[in-house]
Amino acid sequence: GIWQDMTSAIAQNRDIAVDGVLRFANDFDQLLENAGGDGALATLDSQLVDGLLTKNAFREKVGEIVGWQDTALNGIGFQSYLAVHSDPSAGSDAQDQLIGVLTVQGGIVESGAGGVDVANAEMLVDQIRMAKDDDQIKALVMRVDSPGGSAFASELIREELAALQAVGKPVVASFGPVAASGGYWISADADAIYAEPTTITGSIGIFGLVPNVSRSLDAIGINADGVSSAPLARGLSVVGELSEQAKKILQLSIEHGYDEFIDLVATGRNMPKASVEAIAQGRVWSGTAALEIGLVDELGDLEDAIARAAELA
């Protein structure tokens, strides 16, 4: 599972036993007592860090490695670094053979402002269309870090990706920390899917939620009433109880959406529907487990996905 992958990675990177990592996690109180209450010393004793330095001493240590420019560390700013490395084809003869990278980060919504916590489907669709119309871009890598969101918005993105594939441009999905529910919906048809071992993915399912404050209003003596031309004319009111008819409509709609999700995954992953149903029902999987059950093709990072896209292009 994710915990085993994480502790193994820490142990390997620090060249220590996994038991030492587990002891730090499970018995930190004892380690802290042994270190006289000094958390930094307890971390050093557990070999999770190489040394303890003040900020100034650390700066001097870095200076010994990278050198100095007068009184400043010898280095470049982050923006300057990006300016040099932003174009992977810079300095090569492959200017007309580019791999596009599309980032889908945050909850998936139909429209509205984008940002760290929001993946705007309208903006993403426009970007995918630009990649489709750009003759220099031969394939697209979609980096997904999303817990999902609107099923409708997810389908808009998936349809545009399908249009990109239809003109002969492969799509490779690269999963970050989370690629679940709608995040998997948009990825299921990809030509290849890469995940990190600790990625949380799957969550093949749909749910609906209708907020209701009628009991809260009752508690303070406020009642809602009204007349309508038909039983469903009032829509889904937050101040009244859902009718049995409305509940039935919601349930049927959700079940239909779930069936579509199952069909989509079965088609995209070339799996029988029964096999998808067995691993669906909203359950989440680590990247390692997802590889075993066929939800992803390879374990790897963004660079691995880009390399695969280049092979497919």
Predicted regions and their residues:
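Amphipathic alpha-helical substructures
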Residues: D19-S46, G51, N270-G300
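C-terminal intrinsically disordered, low-complexity extensions immediately downstream
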Residues: D304-A313
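Active/binding-pocket-proximal capping segment
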Residues: P147, G282-V284, A305-I306
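Small-residue-centered hinge/linker elements
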Residues: G1-G37, V49-G51, R59, G63-V172, ...
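Beta->alpha turn/N-cap motifs
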Residues: T54-N56, L302-E303
